Amino acid sequence: MKKAIIIGSGIGGIATALRLRSMNYDVTVFENNDFPGGKLTSFDLGHYRFDAGPSLLTMPHFIDELFDLFNENPRDHFNYKKKDISCKYFWDDGTKLSAYSDKIKFTKEIENILGVKQSIVSAYLLKAKKKYELTKRMFLEQSLHKLKTYFTKDLLNGVFNIFSFQINKTLNQVNASELKEPHLVQLFNRFATYNGSSPYKTPGMMTLVQHLEQEYGTFVSDKGMQNITNSLYNLALRQGVDFKFNNYVSEILVSNKIATGIKVGDKTYESDIVISNMDVVPTYRNLLKNHYQPEKILNQERSSSALIFYWGVKKEFKNLDLHNIFFSKDYKNEFQTIFENNTISADPTIYINITSKDVKGDAPINCENWFVMINSPNDSGQDWDNMIDQVKSNVIKKINKKLKVNIED
């Protein structure tokens, strides 16, 4: 039986382990922590439970697919429901808008609140869908590292339609041109942040990001996001995947440009396949330090990051939902502050995730668990202690003003 080693038990590592196991590989996952999941974990603060990392669930059928590989019923292990409202949006001028999962309801809401005709928004959404359909096979479902990918019908379709991708314009330019209405432009600009980009820099092709949310909807797990990790980890155990926790991988072993195993402490483990689920920069800098370094890739501009507060709130807010966005007044300035000044705007856009809206055990009765996230620059030596104190103060003031409360009471 061929052997496969996975470095890191994040959700990508677990999913990869399952797919290789379904192909009859003997799979071992090495993890530095003493728990699986990587960023997709949770923790408790008193009587409140919080998802520590990713908070948005789309396309859960890909999770179901992993159970299907082993003829197991996903509903026996992982359950979720579709949200009627994907996100609630709030602006400084008092404008409020609910982004419904149903496209007709969503476009009607936009027309009623912002005065933009349904036909305009529908045309915009259709363009985004076409971009996704033209690129998904090549970029999402095939490996760009395989030569055969470049000799497929999918690639030819992409080449022939390259001008429809709007790569010569920024996302903001596309949105401003096609949607015009400032609130709506800001709403669709925010999807650049899903991969840590600025809508004023990222190409117009990125309109396809929002398509996943609008086309497939937003979902919530009945036990929170960590149940994705727990259910797939337990599936992997049932299928014979071996997990080695508290094992720090110090090196990927390479022979003739082929990965042949790993080194953990003074031990070596040989394998037919080695897959790193770590981020690309630490993989090269730490695990492949004595080998070729693709400097052009490794020195690319870093994405934005996030500053997250976890607050137990002794009150329920009926006007909020699972996902909520409070926009900054000057979006362009916010991104300039992040990417050019390497700091956080005094008026940041605030994302509040409240899983207790749907998972009642996540907070005490009449209380809520708030996951409060702010876009921030990457870590480049800033005085984070001072910055965090100031941001927290600004965020609380903004929330209190918008919701007409004092959340610290």
Give, region by region, the residue ranges found by the protein language model.
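N-terminal glycine-rich phosphate/pyrophosphate-binding loop and immediately adjacent elements
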Residues: K2-K136
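A short, glycine/Asx- and small/polar-enriched loop/turn
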Residues: W91-D93, S197-T202, L253-T260, I365-E368
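Rossmann-like flavin
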Residues: D92-T202
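Residues forming anionic-ligand binding surfaces in small-molecule and nucleic-acid pockets
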Residues: T202-E213, I365, N375
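Helical element adjacent to the flavin cofactor pocket in flavoenzyme catalytic cores
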Residues: L208-A259
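Mid-domain catalytic core of redox enzymes
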Residues: S250-P364
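Conserved flavin/dinucleotide-binding core of flavoenzymes
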Residues: L322-H323, E334-D409
